[in-house]
Amino acid sequence: MIIDKNGFIHHVFFWLKNPESKEDLQQLIEGLNQLSKVSTIIDFNIGKPAGTNRKVIDNTWSVSWLLLFDSGDDQETYQADPIHLKFIDECSHLWNKVLIYDTVNF
């Protein structure tokens, strides 16, 4: 997908408290799939580390959540959406660290 010049990319990385727990992983993935229903999201991807091995690559996270929005305003709307707030309430106990990278075009 080509990102519009005003587009906004929101990339979230989750480190699970119990990375060996298939149940916790599944619960987070189910939560993200529900979260994808927020109307301002253009597209999304739920990913895992690719297993590449170079010094510059961090493979220590458990799940990534890549979101595309039409604008920064749409991303702000997403942040306050009840679906997003419910996700945080129901799933935040699963992770011990979250790191987010937000990008826009030059």
What are these regions (language model features)?
Residues M1-S62, D70-T77, V104-F106:
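Short S/T/G/P-rich N-terminal loop/turn motif that feeds into the first structured element of a domain
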Residues V38-T40, L68-Y101:
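An amphipathic, aromatic/His-enriched active-site/gating alpha helix that lines ligand/cofactor pockets
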